[in-house]
Swiss-Prot record:
It catalyses: 5-[(5-phospho-1-deoxy-D-ribulos-1-ylimino)methylamino]-1-(5-phospho-beta-D-ribosyl)imidazole-4-carboxamide + L-glutamine = D-erythro-1-(imidazol-4-yl)glycerol 3-phosphate + 5-amino-1-(5-phospho-beta-D-ribosyl)imidazole-4-carboxamide + L-glutamate + H(+); L-glutamine + H2O = L-glutamate + NH4(+). This is Imidazole glycerol phosphate synthase subunit HisH. InterPro entries: Class_I_gatase-like, GATASE, Imidazole-glycPsynth_HisH. Its main location: cytoplasm. Pfam families: GATase (PF00117). IGPS catalyzes the conversion of PRFAR and glutamine to IGP, AICAR and glutamate. The HisH subunit catalyzes the hydrolysis of glutamine to glutamate and ammonia as part of the synthesis of IGP and AICAR. The resulting ammonia molecule is channeled to the active site of HisF. It comes from Trichormus variabilis (strain ATCC 29413 / PCC 7937) (Anabaena variabilis). The gene is hisH. PANTHER family: IMIDAZOLE GLYCEROL PHOSPHATE SYNTHASE SUBUNIT HISH (PTHR42701:SF1). Heterodimer of HisH and HisF. Keywords: Amino-acid biosynthesis, Cytoplasm, Glutamine amidotransferase, Histidine biosynthesis, Hydrolase, Lyase. Disulfide bonds: none annotated.
Length: 211
């Protein structure tokens, strides 16, 4: 079974991500060891919480360069929730620079009548890269589970793999570019749809191993 390293920097619910990966047919290992990231077949960066503590926690564990090296190597990489946001250059939530792997900023939802912030609960994706491996075997507008007050705004729109609409605001819900994928929602909390997305990621890992 493919070995998927789940990065532990004390900013995520790692147990439910690992459970989802096991169901998807992978062997998850929770780690912040550079060697284990290098040895793994794929890497997942989960995360819940605030932007500044997250990037500080990654940097204090010397994980910034290993993450960049992993992505540059072509190894399948998946960011989840805050793990998507910290791939960007900066966030309105904090003052720390992000990893800057994807050009763009993290912005806050604007208050408007009839919506709550955070955007919390089930919502439908609009797939802007419908042929992305992440969306294989999914219905056209799948329902997934969100909890966030901030969203990513990439400079290059072609990296956007899906959007979601909250009130009148349509924002990026996922990005995909070559081996780098990241989602704002929580696949591990998104029932069968989320499990299928994790299974699709694991399938890509298998293909990479076989190539």
């Amino acid at each position: 079974m493919p070995v998927v390293a789940v990065i532990d920097y004390e900013m995520g619910n790692l147990h439910s991500v690992c459970k989802g990966l096991e169901k998807a047919g992978a062997t998850p290992i929770i780690t912040h060891s550079h060697q284990e990231l290098t040895k793994a077949d794929a890497v997942i960066l989960p995360g819940v919480g605030a932007f500044d503590p997250a990037v500080q926690s990654l940097r204090s564990r010397d994980l910034e360069q290993p993450i960049k090296d992993t992505i540059a190597s072509g190894k399948p990489f998946l960011g989840i929730c805050l793990g998507l946001q910290i791939l960007f250059e900066s966030s309105a939530e904090g003052t720390q620079p992000g990893l800057g792997i994807i050009k763009g900023k993290v912005r806050r939802f604007i208050s408007e009548p009839g919506i709550t912030i955070p955007h919390m609960g089930w919502n439908q994706l609009e797939l802007t890269q419908p042929k992305s491996i992440l969306w294989e075997h999914l219905p056209p507008q799948p329902w997934v589970y969100f909890v966030h007050s901030y969203y990513v705004d990439p400079v290059e729109p072609q990296v956007r793999a899906a959007t979601v609409t909250h009130g009148t605001q349509t924002v990026t819900a996922a990005i995909a570019h070559e081996n780098l994928m990241a989602v704002q929602f929580h696949p591990e909390k998104s029932s069968n749809i989320g499990l299928q997305i994790l299974s699709n990621f694991v399938s890509q890992v298998r293909e990479k191993i076989a190539a």
